[in-house]
Amino acid sequence: MGGRYCEDCAYQVINEKNHYIKGIGNKQSNKIIVFPHLGFSDKTIINSEAFKQISELYDTLFDRNILDDYYITCFVKCPISIKHPIDVMTKARCYNYLREEITNNKYNILILLGNACSLINVRPHSTNNVYRNCTGHYVFVNYSPFVIRYDLLKDSYISKFTSIFKAIAYNNLKEFIIKDL
């Protein structure tokens, strides 16, 4: 499955050998989107409902495939089940993979979706801010993943992501308050 970090992980046993979730998209991009995890029935990012919705929005805004401009990955590298919560050791193992993906991509923009920020231990003050880490990289945080209560909050999701994608595309972060992490 995943390799050296997955040894003795409960999710490796649950998911057998063939369900390791790999990132997709442009590995040379300096922009990364991190989903917290996929549901147990999702085997790949591209088939997940959350990816389909964010991809459709991006295509509508820019008439481009999001995979041409972004690298997209998950924090937890196995599809997870509600019956088996993510424990501290699982977070630590998966964080090692994410750290390698982020380091190898030399990102400048990182968009954390859902609870990915808490899994990575980023503690933002507000989702209306953009955070700059100590190396000058920008981190966008969105507590509202597309997969939860999307039907009730669709307009606010679309508005939030439209402003994020446009700010990044046009290199204009003026509408966001930039704070240091």
Q: What does each model-found stretch correspond to?
A:
Residues 1-181:
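A polyanion-binding, active-site-adjacent surface
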